Amino acid sequence: MTSPSPLVGIIMGSDSDLPTMAAAIAVCEEFAVPTEVAIISAHRTPERMVEYAQTAHQRGLRIIIAGAGGAAHLPGMVAALTPLPVIGVPVQTKTLQGVDSLYSIVQMPGGIPVATVAIGNAKNAGLLAVQILASHNPVLLEKVQQYRQSLETMVLDKQAELERLGYRAYLDQQNQ
């Protein structure tokens, strides 16, 4: 049995980024979107990065999620080398808590956009990739709508519990 061709490439500059990027992988798995996952360093494996980005479209990918910390050149360089949408995930660093990564990814020159999520928020990167794919896939669109409905239900359930308990008891329950 052949597994479906990956639609989303999830790449990161280092294996230390994997704990962050795992959330994007999990979201794609939850929505049954096939992925490929790779460690590709813009600085340590530049030729590999170029080859990956330039062949992504021909290999069937539709979106690339790229996570990086520090100088965080991976998302922008990949975006410069591929016609596909690139979603950048700034990975939190010890020195500047990921602000350096965020600025590096979000400050792209005109014509080479990188959609950028919050520091460490690979889950939203995965959700954005799924939503982009859902714009041309009615089955996936239905799954996204169901997911959004589940978020609404969760908030309404919390509101009902807050009303039932009152704010003090609600906070006490959360702190246990």
From Swiss-Prot:
Pathway participation: Purine metabolism; IMP biosynthesis via de novo pathway; 5-amino-1-(5-phospho-D-ribosyl)imidazole-4-carboxylate from 5-amino-1-(5-phospho-D-ribosyl)imidazole (N5-CAIR route): step 2/2
Keywords noted in UniProt: Isomerase, Purine biosynthesis
Coiled-coil ranges from the UniProt annotation: none
Enzyme Commission number(s) from the entry: 5.4.99.18
Pfam families referenced in this protein's UniProt entry, alphabetically: AIRC (PF00731)
Gene3D superfamilies found in the cross-reference section: 3.40.50.1970
InterPro entries: PurE_ClassI, PurE_dom, PurE_prokaryotes
Gene Ontology annotations of biological process type: 'de novo' IMP biosynthetic process
EC class (word): isomerase
Alphabetized GO MF terms: 5-(carboxyamino)imidazole ribonucleotide mutase activity
Reaction equations catalysed: 5-carboxyamino-1-(5-phospho-D-ribosyl)imidazole + H(+) = 5-amino-1-(5-phospho-D-ribosyl)imidazole-4-carboxylate
Binding annotation for substrate: S14, D17, R44
Matches recorded under PANTHER family: PHOSPHORIBOSYLAMINOIMIDAZOLE CARBOXYLASE, PHOSPHORIBOSYLAMINOIMIDAZOLE CARBOXYLASE CATALYTIC SUBUNIT
Matching NCBIfam families: purE (TIGR01162)
Entry's family note: Belongs to the AIR carboxylase family. Class I subfamily.
Function per UniProt: Catalyzes the conversion of N5-carboxyaminoimidazole ribonucleotide (N5-CAIR) to 4-carboxy-5-aminoimidazole ribonucleotide (CAIR).
Protein name per the record: N5-carboxyaminoimidazole ribonucleotide mutase
Species the sequence originates in: Synechocystis sp. (strain ATCC 27184 / PCC 6803 / Kazusa)
